[in-house]
């Protein structure tokens, strides 16, 4: 998308191009890494690069991932929530709509299951951590696959998904077990069987320290370019920064965005792109 993540690609590149065009040689080396697969767990992207060429990176590096931000450019992301994507496949018995007693309606069972899981999660895991925006764990039913193509058929299979972004101190295994309990209750009451799969499961690595050199470098550059005080924060979204952090490499996520990623009419503003390039140039120069 134009914001997610072409804006970060272009702004980081043009910050470096400005130095080259002006004949400025920085005091330290600068590297840009462009990786694939970020939306699908980075198995063929940064994860592969870190495994195959981990020698490219050092804990002393200033690692910036331009993949999240705020409209005023003052949010520096230093932490991400744990998370998992859950898939529920509900099996019942298909039949004609005129004789529902001969079938087991998986859509009705799925609706009950979604409501039960949603209510349980959002009333059990209510802690807040003001480092993060939003400050609570989020548990959202999202995708629903098509079942029967016509109105007069009772569906015998339904598939739906949850997207869960969980504050780091919670135990994902415990949450998974409680979800299974809700599944078992609804299955016993409705006669369906349920296959519960993990599409992905990521425990949050340790946050990048607030006083790390990369955070301080961004704070100085943002103050110079925007005359604003930046602040370290956490987000619910996932970026490739977590893979750096898992390797003990302190990374910061930063850009100036209106948070239109994955939305209809996703956009980035040219003034933001130019300002971000200026911030990157200041960081490259060690200012």
Identify the residue ranges that each predicted region occupies.
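Metal-dependent amide/peptide-bond hydrolase catalytic core
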Residues: 68-73, 78, 84-287
């Amino acid at each position: 998308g134009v914001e997610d993540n072409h804006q970060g690609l272009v702004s980081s590149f043009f910050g470096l191009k400005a130095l080259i065009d002006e004949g400025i040689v920085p005091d330290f080396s600068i590297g840009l890494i462009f990786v694939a697969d970020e939306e699908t767990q980075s198995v063929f992207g940064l994860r592969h690069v870190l495994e195959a060429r981990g020698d490219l990176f050092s804990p002393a590096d200033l690692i910036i991932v331009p993949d999240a931000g705020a409209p005023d450019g003052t949010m520096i992301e230093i932490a991400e929530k744990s998370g998992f994507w859950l898939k529920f496949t509900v099996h019942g018995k298909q039949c004609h709509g005129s004789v529902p007693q001969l079938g087991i309606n998986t859509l009705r069972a799925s609706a009950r299951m979604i409501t039960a899981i949603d209510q349980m999660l959002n009333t059990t895991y209510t802690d807040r951590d003001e480092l993060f925006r939003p400050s609570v764990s989020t548990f959202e039913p999202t995708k629903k696959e098509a079942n029967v193509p016509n109105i007069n058929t009772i569906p015998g299979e339904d598939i739906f998904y949850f997207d869960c972004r969980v504050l780091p101190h919670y135990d994902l295994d415990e949450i998974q077990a409680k979800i299974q309990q809700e599944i078992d209750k609804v299955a016993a009451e409705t006669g369906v069987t349920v296959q519960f799969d993990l599409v992905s499961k990521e425990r949050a690595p340790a946050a990048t320290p607030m006083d790390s050199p990369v955070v301080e470098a961004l704070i100085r550059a943002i103050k110079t370019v925007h005359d604003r005080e930046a602040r370290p924060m956490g987000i619910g979204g996932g970026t490739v920064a977590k893979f750096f952090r898992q390797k003990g490499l302190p990374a910061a996520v930063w850009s100036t965005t209106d948070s239109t990623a994955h939305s209809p009419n996703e956009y980035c503003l040219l003034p933001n792109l130019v300002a971000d390039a200026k911030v990157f140039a200041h960081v490259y120069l060690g200012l």
